[in-house]
Every structure is written in structure tokens, then in C-alpha cells.
Amino acid sequence: MFYSGTIPNEIPMNNYCLEVIRQDLTQTRTIELPSPAELTLTNDQAVISIKRFGLTANNITYGVAGDIIGYWQFFPAEGDYGRIPVWGIGTVIASGQTDLKVGDEYYGYYPMASYLVVNPAQATTQGFKDGAEHRGEWF
């Protein structure tokens, strides 16, 4: 459904994540995420608000090859659902890390979502590797 003018109040515009059925990428759902303010972070975590991302034919390849190449492991979802990775830009909005400061921007691999909780490792002035256990072998 497309809307013009003001967005009706019944459309949630909070924190979300887009998921697809891994075996049928035409079937999608949007799940609501908790507010980043409600998250309990450890000292080695940070929250990156995803500001923009690109969606191209290449992202469909990520979905089609998700099981073969391991793309579904990057951002795990429940059951038969998966989260297709996208390239985008995000801003740190909360951090227990001394290396990642609130306001820092990062270009990287994200889910189609409002934010991502990361476990920064090997941080440099050029960026960082996400040390989350389920992404460890991939990133």
C-alpha cells in the first residue's frame, strides 16, 4: 500500500527489522524491535542506528545463496525467516566502547533494520570488526 501526504497514525514508525522467508524471498514481514533505550548493553557492545542502505539485485543474490554461502548467519532470525544483508551507513547512538564514540559513522554490512547491536573488536581509526560470536567466522 502506498500513501501520499501525511502517514496515518496506525502505521508503526518505531524500530523495525525486515525479514523474509528464506525459501521464498517474496514473503516478508516487518517485526518491531525494542527501543535502543530499553536495551541492556554490556561494556563491549555498541548500538548503531542504520541511517541509509542500498538495496540492489546483489542483495537478492545474498538471499538466494544464503544457505550455501552463509549469509543467513550474519543476522540470525527465528524459524524459517532470514535477514538479507545490505550495505549502508550507520551512526553510533550508544556505546560502552572507548573506541566507538556516540556520533561516529560507519559504512558497513547491516540488516534491513532500524539499528544493530555490535560487539566491536579490532577497532582502528579506519573501522572495526564485529566480534559477535555468530558473525565471528564471517567478519
For the regions a protein language model found, what residue spans apply to each?
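Glycine-rich beta-strand-centered segment in the early N-terminal region that forms part
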Residues: 42-53, 67-117, 122
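Hydrophobic, helix-prone linear segments
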Residues: 7-31
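A short N-terminal beta-strand-loop micro-motif at the entrance of redox/enzyme domains
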Residues: 22-52, 57
